[in-house]
Structures are given as structure tokens and as C-alpha cells.
A protein has these predicted regions:
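N-terminal "arm"/small-domain region of PLP-dependent enzymes with the aminotransferase-like
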Residues: 2, 23-65, 69, 265-268, ...
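PLP-dependent aminotransferase class I/II
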Residues: 72-76, 84-87, 148, 152, ...
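Short beta-strand-to-turn element immediately C-terminal to the catalytic PLP-Schiff-base lysine
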Residues: 213-214, 227-232, 285
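Conserved active-site segment immediately N-terminal to the catalytic lysine
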Residues: 189-222, 238, 263-268
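Phosphate-binding glycine-rich loop
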Residues: 64-111, 125-129, 135-137, 202
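PLP-dependent aminotransferase-like
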Residues: 102-191, 198
């Protein structure tokens, strides 16, 4: 009986191989075929030109490596870009979120609602303040946090919402702002993916109570590391300045004692050393000059991917949000498991064998052991969990050539068709 079963399976496998040959399919590299690419391509990469290098060299030759004029220059440039009244730059995107949570008044026992499909910092910033993250599910087509799920999660302990502009497409800021006003909550927009994006004609960074940016190398513009918090609220702005620099001030209006002299300063809050260096700021100022080019190229690549993958029934393309003119940070491709003979992990590995190195953004935050120990369990956000099981992040960055883009499309198509469920 066992031998008969094995013979049957061998026969089926042989027929499938013959069918693929008849259809002219190329064998995937993981099955012994030839890789689409000779060299590896990764999901993200910074773009640094001679102007960026010169900007950094100029600072290195100057008197101010930190706490110098480039900080104010960068903050002014961010305000001009977004229309926000105030910008406070800092050491990284996580620091920006922590500062924003502190400025929002998050403390022990407070709840803050966020999405599980994000980097851990979006929730960790709440824990830093002694609060508790509450996870709300995502829209199954846009993958952004669902405003109705946010409102359903509000309790008397809710203090704020951290809404992530996932992949660079804006969250529904009108609806989220309405919900937050109705319930007296602070809206913190985690805009790590969204610099250069507009929502209904207004720049992200000028709409929410606070918006945070990240300038990690895989982001659209980079300072090596770096972050920023933008706001239109002067009170929040002054708090952010304190939290960035140890809670120390030289402003007489903020001091409790009379100044002894020009050297005098006071610590009036418990803050941190979250300062950005002038070296980072100079690089970012130069990078921001290229933001329109970066945005346009990313949009071109996304459009080409969408055109290619929308035709394949075993793949699902993320829904475009028409109100969001986006600087796309990530390209998320989703497999349709019932139409394939392989799962996401196998698809991922097959692409790697073609020298197309993808990633997965993100593991739901509450899956991590640290969060499990805090009492979070799987099943909280079904849409987010299903997305995680099916998604891949494809290469997307400014320096990709047309040939790079077409090689990614060829590799994905090759694998999707070869392993199509018949």
C-alpha cells in the first residue's frame, strides 16, 4: 500500500513537471534552475551622493559637531516642507516617539492605542512611560489601523493614539482626529514611513497633534540615524525641547530660581540625551533637497510593480489610498495561499535563491516574547495576523534601475506561476 501511494505521488509530481515544461516555465533557482539575477538586491538601501558627502565634510571642518547651527537649519527646513509650526529633531525615530508620548502626558496606568503591524518602537514608547499599549486591528486592504477599531478600543484609561502611516500611505487622519477630539485623546502620528506624503492636499506632519519622523538608512531620506517630532502646539513644543536635552533649560521663563549669571541653567524635568549631531543634520538637509526625486522614483517603481502583479491571481496588491499622495517607503506584496502550492516562507526562500532578498514588515508586536509575558495573546487582531502570514516586502529604493525592477518582477512572476495551484 505504501509503495502504491509513493508511486501515485511520483506520478503526480512528474505530470506537474511536464505541465510546467509545456507552459514554458523556467525552473526556479531553488529547484535547480538559473537565478534571475547574478547579484543580490535587497529590500532597501540609502542613496548618498557627492553633495551629501560634502555637507558632512563641511561640518567636520567646522567648530560645531553638535548643538550647532545645522540643528536649527534642519528644523526650519522640516517646517517649510510640512507646514508645521515647530520641529524638534532628535537622535532617532524611537527617541521621537518616546518624547511625543511623554509630551502627551502618558504615565502609569494609561492606555495608548496603536497597530500591531509596525516596528516595536510604536508600542515600546508607551511602555517607557509606564503605560500599556492596546492593539487595534488593521484595514484588510490598506493595512493601516482601522479607525473604527480604534474607537471601539477606547476606555476611561485611554490617553492617546499612535497611528502608523504604514508603507508611507497616510492613515485616515480626518476620522482619527475626529475620534481623538471626541474622546479628549492626543493623536500621535508615527510618520516613520511618510515624509513627503500629503493627505487631502496637506502635508503629513502638519495635521496631527504630533507627528514623528525616522531617518534610518532604509527610510526615504537618512541622516545615518535621526528622528524628529513636529507639532503646531507651542506647549507641546516646549516640552519636547526639554525632553530632548535632560530636561534642562536656559529660558528664564521656565526657571524656578534667579539666574546666577550667563552660564546658569536649570533642570526642570527629567529628560534624556536625545540630541542629534550637526553631522547628521547636515546630511539630512542635503538629503531633503532630493526628496522630490526620491518620491517620484519610488512612485514609478510602485506603479510598475502594481501593473505587473495585479494580473496574477495568486498575488494580492495593497490598495492605494487616493487621498494620500505618498512617498512610498515599503512595497508589500501578499500571496493568496489557496492559489499556491507553497507558503510565504517558501516563497521568500525561493526569491532569495533568485538573488532577490525580501523582508517581512512586520511581525505583529504582541507576538514577541516580551509582550507575551505582559499577557498579550495571539488572536487580538485577526486581520493583522493574516497579513503577517501572507506578506513580503519587495525591494524599493531610489537607486534601483529599470533593469533591477524588471528582475524583481521576473523573479516574483517566475515563482508565482511555477507554484500556481492547479
Amino acid at each position: 500500500m505504501h509503495e502504491k501511494c509513493m508511486s501515485f505521488l511520483t506520478l503526480v509530481a512528474g505530470r506537474r513537471t511536464e505541465e510546467r515544461k509545456i507552459r514554458g516555465m523556467k525552473k526556479p533557482a531553488i529547484e535547480g534552475g538559473t537565478p534571475v539575477r547574478e547579484t543580490k538586491i535587497y529590500y532597501g538601501h540609502q542613496y548618498i551622493d557627492d553633495a551629501d558627502i560634502q555637507a558632512v565634510v563641511d561640518v567636520l571642518k567646522s567648530d560645531n559637531l553638535t548643538c550647532g547651527p545645522k540643528i536649527g537649519e534642519l528644523e526650519e527646513k522640516l517646517c517649510q516642507l510640512t507646514g508645521a509650526r515647530y520641529a524638534v529633531v532628535c537622535s532617532n525615530g524611537t527617541a521621537a516617539l518616546h518624547m511625543a508620548a511623554m509630551a502627551a502626558g502618558v504615565g502609569a496606568g494609561d492606555e495608548v492605542i496603536t497597530t500591531p503591524i509596525t516596528f516595536a518602537a510604536s508600542a515600546n514608547c508607551v511602555l517607557y512611560c509606564g503605560g500599556r499599549p492596546v492593539f487595534a486591528d488593521i484595514d484588510p486592504e490598506t493595512y493601516n489601523i482601522d479607525p473604527e477599531k480604534v474607537e471601539a478600543a477606547i476606555t476611561e484609561r485611554t490617553k492617546a493614539v499612535v497611528a502608523v502611516d504604514y508603507t508611507g500611505q497616510s492613515v485616515e487622519l480626518d476620522r482619527l482626529s475626529e475620534i481623538c477630539r471626541k474622546h479628549g485623546l492626543v493623536l500621535i502620528e508615527d510618520g516613520a514611513h511618510v515624509i513627503g506624503t500629503t493627505y487631502k492636499g496637506r502635508a503629513n506632519g502638519s495635521i496631527s497633534d504630533m507627528t514623528t519622523f525616522s531617518f534610518h538608512p532604509v527610510k526615504t531620506v537618512t541622516g545615518g540615524e535621526g528622528g524628529a517630532v513636529l507639532t503646531n502646539d507651542e506647549t507641546l513644543y516646549k516640552k519636547l525641547l526639554l525632553y530632548r536635552a535632560h530636561g534642562i533649560t536656559r529660558e528664564e521663563a521656565q526657571m524656578e530660581h534667579e539666574a546666577d549669571g550667563a552660564w546658569y541653567y536649570e533642570q526642570v524635568e527629567l529628560g534624556y540625551n536625545y540630541r542629534m549631531t550637526d553631522i547628521q543634520a547636515a546630511l539630512l538637509i542635503s538629503q531633503l533637497d532630493k526628496l522630490p526625486l526620491f518620491k517620484q522614483r519610488r512612485k514609478e517603481i510602485v506603479a510598475r510593480y502594481n501593473e505587473a502583479f495585479d494580473r496574477l491571481p495568486m498575488l494580492f496588491v495593497q490598495k492605494e489610498i487616493p487621498e494620500s499622495d505618498t512617498t512610498r517607503h515599503l512595497y508589500i506584496l501578499r500571496i493568496v495561499p489557496e492559489r499556491l502550492t507553497i507558503d510565504r516562507k517558501q516563497f521568500f526562500e525561493a526569491l532569495a535563491a533568485e538573488n532577490v532578498c525580501c523582508n517581512v514588515h512586520y511581525i505583529p508586536t504582541y507576538y514577541f516574547p516580551y509582550y507575551e509575558k505582559q499577557g498579550y495573546k495571539k488572536g487580538l487582531c485577526p486581520n493583522a495576523e493574516k497579513l503577517y502570514e501572507e506578506m513580503l516586502s519587495l525591494p524599493l529604493y531610489y537607486a534601483m534601475t529599470d533593469a533591477d525592477v524588471e528582475s524583481v518582477i521576473e523573479a516574483v512572476t517566475k515563482i508565482a506561476l511555477y507554484y500556481e495551484q492547479k
